[in-house]
Amino acid sequence: MCVRRSLVGLTFCTCYLASYLTNKYVLSVLKFTYPTLFQGWQTLIGGLLLHVSWKLGWVEINSSSRSHVLVWLPASVLFVGIIYAGSRALSRLAIPVFLTLHNVAEVIICGYQKCFQKEKTSPAKICSALLLLAAAGCLPFNDSQFNPDGYFWAIIHLLCVGAYKILQKSQKPSALSDIDQQYLNYIFSVVLLAFASHPTGDLFSVLDFPFLYFYRFHGSCCASGFLGFFLMFSTVKLKNLLAPGQCAAWIFFAKIITAGLSILLFDAILTSATTGCLLLGALGEALLVFSERKSS
C-alpha cells in the first residue's frame, strides 16, 4: 500500500511539472495568448478522454439528475474563471511568482472557515495564512519583471480558486463524485469558451499567429491537452488514496520542483528581494502542510 501511494504521488508530481512547463512554453515562448481557444482545446481533450475512460470502464461517472447539475453550475462557472484567468496570468508571470499568488486562495478559504463557519483554526494555520498573504503582498513591489496585467489576472484566478474550493466543500457530502464534477466542468467549459472565442476576438486573431502551422506548436498543444487530463486524474487519485496532510505534502513538493526547474528553463530575473518573497511564500505553505498533517 505504501509503494502504491508513493507511485501515485510521484505520478502526480510528474504530471504537475510537465503540465506547467508545457503550458508555460506555449503561453510565453510560443506566445499563444488566445485563452478561449487554448483552454477550450484543453478542456475538450480532457472531456473526450474522460468520456472514453468512462465507456471503457476505467472510471465511473454517475448519471446525475438535473437538480444536481444545476446545483454544481456555479462551480463550473468558477472553474472557467480559474482556467481562463490562470492562462492569462501564467503567460505574463514567472511560474514561481504565479504559484506564490495562487497560494493566497488558501488564505481566502481559511478566512471563510474562521469568520463564517466559526471553525477552530490552529495557530500554525493562522501563521501560514499570514505568511502567504505577506509574500503575495510584497511581490508586486519587489518583482523586477512586474507586469500589471499578469498580477490582475492572477488575482482574478486566486479569487476563483478560493470561491471554487469553498463551494466544493460546502456541498460535501455531494451526490457528485470528483470525477462527476470534473466531467461537468469540462462540458460547461467547452461550450462557454467556444461561444466566448468570437466576442473576445480570439477566433479570428489566431489566424495571425506565426507558429500556427508549425509542428512544435501542434505537438505542444496536444501534449498540454493530454497532460492536463492526466494531472486531473492523478490529483483525484491522490486525494482519494491519501490523507489530506499527505496530499498537501505531495502538492507542496510538486510546486517546489516545478518552481525550481522553471527558473532554469525560462527567462526569470530573481533579485534577492524577489527570492525572499518566494521563500516566505514557501515557508507559509510548508506551515500549511504541517497544520494539515497535524489535524489529519
Swiss-Prot record:
Task: Tell me the membrane topology, using the record's own terms.
Answer: Multi-pass membrane protein
Q: InterPro entries from the entry?
A: TPT_transporter
Annotated function: Golgi-localized UDP-N-acetylglucosamine (UDP-GlcNAc) transporter that transports UDP-N-acetylglucosamine into Golgi lumen. Contributes to lysosomal targeting of NPC2, a key protein required for lysosomal cholesterol exiting, and that utilizes the mannose-6-phosphate (M6P) modification pathway for its lysosomal targeting.
Listed GO MF terms:
antiporter activity; GDP-mannose transmembrane transporter activity; UDP-N-acetylglucosamine transmembrane transporter activity
Q: What induces it?
A: Up-regulated by inducers of the unfolded protein response (UPR), including tunicamycin and thapsigargin.
Task: Name the UniProt key words of this record, in alphabetical order.
Answer: Golgi apparatus, Membrane, Sugar transport, Transmembrane, Transmembrane helix, Transport
Q: Name one GO biological process term.
A: UDP-N-acetylglucosamine transmembrane transport
GO CC, sorted alphabetically, is:
Golgi apparatus; membrane
Organism listed in the record: Homo sapiens (Human)
Q: Which family does it belong to?
A: Belongs to the nucleotide-sugar transporter family. SLC35A subfamily.
Subcellular location, in the record's words? Golgi apparatus, cis-Golgi network membrane
**Lineage, broadest ranks:** Eukaryota, Metazoa, Chordata, Craniata, Vertebrata
This chain's protein is named: UDP-N-acetylglucosamine transporter TMEM241
Q: Where are the transmembrane segments?
A: 7-29, 32-52, 67-87, 93-113, 121-141, 146-166, 187-207, 211-231, 250-270, 271-291
